């Protein structure tokens, strides 16, 4: 269901201390936006209504967090949820930021100097594999290679989904993009780890009897990347043919 336009969203976000108003202007300097810039930096790609961010960020003041979504009408809900979570603990929201960004173009906003330690991807759009739309998946190698450029060596991606096809495909996506899958499960709640934070979507799918799939993948050396953009591969083949 399409979310309705919220005329109050932009003014309220502009008045929010932890909203990044012009995210394309901070490349290489994101850490400087936080009260404690030397802390590890974790991103949530597609933070939605903020259910996950509102749980994890206040509980870990020793880590800086950034929640990203593409529209203000979604981000305003995350802002309110995060704000309430910090208020409930009586602590300042000084280790969290939210920003409106197109995840497919993160390179426009970040540089390798921004040093991402961990990325969370929770219940992203699974995208149909028809007509090439799977390239928009947040775990597609095309996307993972983009994240690699921003991540520290040994940094991790924590991924959860309800979608069987997306998860099974992702089990091949990550290694192709040079990530080692260090942990995986096809039923997260069967032996639920203590560290798992259930999101709104997670609870909804679980109540419907849909198993939650999850994995943790660690960034490996550049020489472990095997995936090549199809267009680049075609150009390479054309060049080799011309050389012959």
Sequence positions of predicted segments:
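S-adenosyl-L-methionine
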Residues: 1-43, 51-60, 80-113
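Conserved glycine-rich SAM-binding loop
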Residues: 48
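Conserved beta-strand/loop positions that form the S-adenosyl-L-methionine
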Residues: 43-45, 68
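Conserved SAM/SAH-binding beta-strand->alpha-helix loop
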Residues: 71
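Conserved beta-strand signature within the Rossmann-like core of class I S-adenosyl-L-methionine
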Residues: 154-161
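A short glycine-rich, Lys/Arg-flanked "PGG" loop and its adjoining helix->strand segment in the class I
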Residues: 138-153
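Class I S-adenosyl-L-methionine
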Residues: 170-244
């Amino acid at each position: 269901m399409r979310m309705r336009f919220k005329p109050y969203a932009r003014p309220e976000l502009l008045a929010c201390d932890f909203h990044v108003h012009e995210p394309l202007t901070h490349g290489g300097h994101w850490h400087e936006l936080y009260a404690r810039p030397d802390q590890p930096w974790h991103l949530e790609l597609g933070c939605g209504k903020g259910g996950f961010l509102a749980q994890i960020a206040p509980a870990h003041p020793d880590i800086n967090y950034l929640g990203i979504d593409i529209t203000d009408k979604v981000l305003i809900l995350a802002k309110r949820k995060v704000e309430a979570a910090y208020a409930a603990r009586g602590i300042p929201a000084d280790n969290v930021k939210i920003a409106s960004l197109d995840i497919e173009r993160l390179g426009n906003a970040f540089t390798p100097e921004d040093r991402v330690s961990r990325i969370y991807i929770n219940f992203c759009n699974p995208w149909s594999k028809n007509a090439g739309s799977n390239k928009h998946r947040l775990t597609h190698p095309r996307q993972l290679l983009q994240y690699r450029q921003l991540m520290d060596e040994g940094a991790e991606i924590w991924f959860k989904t309800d979608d069987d096809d997306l998860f099974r495909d992702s089990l091949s996506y990550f290694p192709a993009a040079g990530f080692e899958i260090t942990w995986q499960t096809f039923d997260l709640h069967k032996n639920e780890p203590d560290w798992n934070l259930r999101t709104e979507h997670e609870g909804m799918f679980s109540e419907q009897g849909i198993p939650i799939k999850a994995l943790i993948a660690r960034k490996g050396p550049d020489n472990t990347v095997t995936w090549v953009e199809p267009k680049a591969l075609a150009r390479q083949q054309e060049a080799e043919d011309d050389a012959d």
